[in-house]
Amino acid sequence: MPQTTDEAASVSTVADIKPRSRDVTDGLEKAAARGMLRAVGMDDEDFAKPQIGVASSWNEITPCNLSLDRLANAVKEGVFSAGGYPLEFGTISVSDGISMGHEGMHFSLVSREVIADSVEVVMQAERLDGSVLLAGCDKSLPGMLMAAARLDLAAVFLYAGSILPGRAKLSDGSERDVTIIDAFEAVGACSRGLMSRADVDAIERAICPGEGACGGMYTANTMASAAEALGMSLPGSAAPPATDRRRDGFARRSGQAVVELLRRGITARDILTKEAFENAIAVVMAFGGSTNAVLHLLAIAHEANVALSLQDFSRIGSGVPHLADVKPFGRHVMSDVDHIGGVPVVMKALLDAGLLHGDCLTVTGHTMAENLAAITPPDPDGKVLRALANPIHPSGGITILHGSLAPEGAVVKTAGFDSDVFEGTARVFDGERAALDALEDGTITVGDAVVIRYEGPKGGPGMREMLAITGAIKGAGLGKDVLLLTDGRFSGGTTGLCVGHIAPEAVDGGPIALLRNGDRIRLDVAGRVLDVLADPAEFASRQQDFSPPPPRYTTGVLSKYVKLVSSAAVGAVCG
């Protein structure tokens, strides 16, 4: 029977489910390639199937990634069941918790670029048709999403899941839930004589009771929530703990989903639109998530060729209330978010208030609004997640600053702030170690504005996280009385008066490089302003004496990184 016009049109628009792997499976000249693939398990009938890369950052160095080998196997089951052929490969992951506070932290942010690059290299070289990207640690999540955006193939992201809280029994007989951030704060308390060494040891032994990423709304959980809001992971998949076997189901369905995306011709950039990034920003703001989300969402948007800027964070943050009472400043952890319905609870509340774009496409092949209608998440419980009518703060948990000290911008986590204005006296340190020494010596006091510079993307290099110093400041009882400013960045576990991502950075001659001990600094959160209170002419004259220090690394990956990396104001991207 002849085809109707509609039938012919339908056939002509069916996507090629092997848009790339034909390069290695089809034709006489591909005999050698097929021979290699036969050696890893493929048979004649498999060469007609789409080849799906299962990219995993599994390793044995950190609990964040331990579940990924199990989940990768479930993903492969899903790919097989949907008619695809999975091929697993690995990439690196750096543990921020282990690399914090020493030279190793220089290598953390660059690992994001290495992950994205390595996934791109394998996907391009082997001509894989689509991917499921598995990650558990802070930089591996954005690294995988950057790769997906750059490649613009069918792709689904899958999170390893968070760790459950530990339970520490202290010397006074009390017990409390603890996360890794408690260890950093305990060090500061112990150094000031506010906690015994025995209690530090008890906390150390309890903070990581098993596998999974750090349990509060720190960077990994923030980015997992953002990935779900972007539409790049299955709805409801961000919150379940790593040990929860629901994750195996999400893994299998992720494998099935990527094959269906191939059949429908849906690629990552069809999902990663400007509106999708606005949804992710809104969810991060409502959760009071990590300031690292600013850096990472800018970088993912760059790879997706989406124009995203700090101004977008300011605009959205001013209209989205902060709803989640979660650590590091609140009482709850990600498993508590899971217990009350997960990320979809926040998304539905924001969608109902007109604060999300419900028509954004997701990896299910449906829109975000359609996904939420299908799973019918409950309303906020009022404890872990507040209703919009009763927010913790009327605006989002992250604020973008500008001013004479940050002409290109800076970022402050305002979730947990008690006041809007802080004015203090500059204590200037070139690097984190000098500031830690001063704190341990007791020379940092109430009213100080501690400036840690030459820690930016180029100057660090690597834009180290300052959790060692912020945790020590809080542990020393100075968390609400000392302002910390840096061209570096902060851990998702940071709380207190902390301004990071100051741009331009010191090594580029930004105003932070010109600060001197005794300068007065003013932070106005409500006004979104960060200023040095100095005579403008006198302050500008200091530029004549500025000379950047020599590079810390002249060989290796960081030497390359310094030559390529851009300002934190645009995501610290390379190219």
Curated annotation (Swiss-Prot):
<comment type="pathway">
    <text>Amino-acid biosynthesis; L-isoleucine biosynthesis; L-isoleucine from 2-oxobutanoate: step 3/4.</text>
</comment>
<keyword id="KW-0100">Branched-chain amino acid biosynthesis</keyword>
<dbReference type="Pfam" id="PF24877">
    <property type="entry name" value="ILV_EDD_C"/>
</dbReference>
<feature type="modified residue" description="N6-carboxylysine">
    <location>
        <position position="139"/>
    </location>
</feature>
<dbReference type="GO" id="GO:0000287">
    <property type="term" value="F:magnesium ion binding"/>
</dbReference>
<dbReference type="InterPro" id="IPR042096">
    <property type="entry name" value="Dihydro-acid_dehy_C"/>
</dbReference>
<dbReference type="GO" id="GO:0009082">
    <property type="term" value="P:branched-chain amino acid biosynthetic process"/>
</dbReference>
<feature type="binding site">
    <location>
        <position position="138"/>
    </location>
    <ligand>
        <name>Mg(2+)</name>
    </ligand>
</feature>
<dbReference type="InterPro" id="IPR000581">
    <property type="entry name" value="ILV_EDD_N"/>
</dbReference>
<keyword id="KW-0479">Metal-binding</keyword>
<feature type="modified residue" description="N-acetylproline">
    <location>
        <position position="2"/>
    </location>
</feature>
<feature type="binding site">
    <location>
        <position position="214"/>
    </location>
    <ligand>
        <name>[2Fe-2S] cluster</name>
    </ligand>
</feature>
<keyword id="KW-0028">Amino-acid biosynthesis</keyword>
<feature type="binding site">
    <location>
        <position position="96"/>
    </location>
    <ligand>
        <name>Mg(2+)</name>
    </ligand>
</feature>
<keyword id="KW-0411">Iron-sulfur</keyword>
<dbReference type="GO" id="GO:0051537">
    <property type="term" value="F:2 iron, 2 sulfur cluster binding"/>
</dbReference>
<dbReference type="GO" id="GO:0004160">
    <property type="term" value="F:dihydroxy-acid dehydratase activity"/>
</dbReference>
<dbReference type="InterPro" id="IPR020558">
    <property type="entry name" value="DiOHA_6PGluconate_deHydtase_CS"/>
</dbReference>
<keyword id="KW-0408">Iron</keyword>
<feature type="binding site">
    <location>
        <position position="64"/>
    </location>
    <ligand>
        <name>[2Fe-2S] cluster</name>
    </ligand>
</feature>
<feature type="binding site" description="via carbamate group">
    <location>
        <position position="139"/>
    </location>
    <ligand>
        <name>Mg(2+)</name>
    </ligand>
</feature>
<keyword id="KW-0001">2Fe-2S</keyword>
<comment type="function">
    <text>Functions in the biosynthesis of branched-chain amino acids. Catalyzes the dehydration of (2R,3R)-2,3-dihydroxy-3-methylpentanoate (2,3-dihydroxy-3-methylvalerate) into 2-oxo-3-methylpentanoate (2-oxo-3-methylvalerate) and of (2R)-2,3-dihydroxy-3-methylbutanoate (2,3-dihydroxyisovalerate) into 2-oxo-3-methylbutanoate (2-oxoisovalerate), the penultimate precursor to L-isoleucine and L-valine, respectively. Is specific for the (R) isomer of 2,3-dihydroxy-3-methylbutanoate, with no catalytic activity against the (S) isomer.</text>
</comment>
<protein>
    <recommendedName>
        <fullName>Dihydroxy-acid dehydratase</fullName>
        <ecNumber>4.2.1.9</ecNumber>
    </recommendedName>
</protein>
<feature type="binding site">
    <location>
        <position position="465"/>
    </location>
    <ligand>
        <name>Mg(2+)</name>
    </ligand>
</feature>
<keyword id="KW-0456">Lyase</keyword>
<dbReference type="GO" id="GO:0009099">
    <property type="term" value="P:L-valine biosynthetic process"/>
</dbReference>
<comment type="pathway">
    <text>Amino-acid biosynthesis; L-valine biosynthesis; L-valine from pyruvate: step 3/4.</text>
</comment>
<dbReference type="InterPro" id="IPR050165">
    <property type="entry name" value="DHAD_IlvD/Edd"/>
</dbReference>
<dbReference type="InterPro" id="IPR037237">
    <property type="entry name" value="IlvD/EDD_N"/>
</dbReference>
<comment type="subunit">
    <text>Homodimer.</text>
</comment>
<keyword id="KW-0007">Acetylation</keyword>
<feature type="binding site">
    <location>
        <position position="137"/>
    </location>
    <ligand>
        <name>[2Fe-2S] cluster</name>
    </ligand>
</feature>
<feature type="active site" description="Proton acceptor">
    <location>
        <position position="491"/>
    </location>
</feature>
<dbReference type="InterPro" id="IPR056740">
    <property type="entry name" value="ILV_EDD_C"/>
</dbReference>
<dbReference type="InterPro" id="IPR004404">
    <property type="entry name" value="DihydroxyA_deHydtase"/>
</dbReference>
<dbReference type="GO" id="GO:0005886">
    <property type="term" value="C:plasma membrane"/>
</dbReference>
<comment type="similarity">
    <text>Belongs to the IlvD/Edd family.</text>
</comment>
<keyword id="KW-0460">Magnesium</keyword>
<dbReference type="Pfam" id="PF00920">
    <property type="entry name" value="ILVD_EDD_N"/>
</dbReference>
<dbReference type="GO" id="GO:0009097">
    <property type="term" value="P:isoleucine biosynthetic process"/>
</dbReference>
